[in-house]
């Protein structure tokens, strides 16, 4: 019984550590994704532009700027 609880706690700790490492890797991206605050187009990923009104990375307008 005690070893089972210990194994469960160890497993949960390992799962937490792996998920935290994955989350840190996502934050290290060079560009910003959809609806993330930006100041200029070069901060957004290649398929997005920095919106003029709210300064978020959004899809480019089909009607031009």
Swiss-Prot record:
One GO cellular component term: extracellular region
Compartment(s) where it occurs, according to its Swiss-Prot or TrEMBL record: Secreted
Protein keywords: Disulfide bond, Ion channel impairing toxin, Knottin, Secreted, Signal, Toxin
Tissues with expression: Expressed by the venom gland.
TM annotation in the entry: none
InterPro entries in alphabetical order: Huwentoxin-1, Huwentoxin_CS1
PROSITE patterns: HWTX_1
Residues annotated as signal peptide: 1-21
Annotated disulfide bonds: 31-45, 38-50, 44-57
MF term (GO), any: ion channel inhibitor activity
Propeptide regions on this chain: 22-29
Family to which this protein belongs: Belongs to the neurotoxin 10 (Hwtx-1) family. 32 (Jztx-16) subfamily.
Role, per record: Probable ion channel inhibitor.
Comment block on domains: The presence of a 'disulfide through disulfide knot' structurally defines this protein as a knottin.
Name used for this protein in its record: U11-theraphotoxin-Cg1b
Organism: Chilobrachys guangxiensis (Chinese earth tiger tarantula)
Highest classification ranks of the organism: Eukaryota, Metazoa, Ecdysozoa, Arthropoda, Chelicerata
């Amino acid at each position: 019984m005690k070893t089972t609880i210990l194994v469960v706690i160890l497993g949960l700790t390992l799962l937490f550590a792996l998920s935290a490492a994955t989350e840190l890797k996502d934050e290290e991206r060079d560009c910003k994704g959809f609806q993330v605050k930006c100041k200029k187009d070069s901060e957004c990923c290649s398929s997005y532009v920095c919106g003029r009104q709210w300064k978020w990375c959004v899809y480019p307008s089909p009607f031009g700027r």
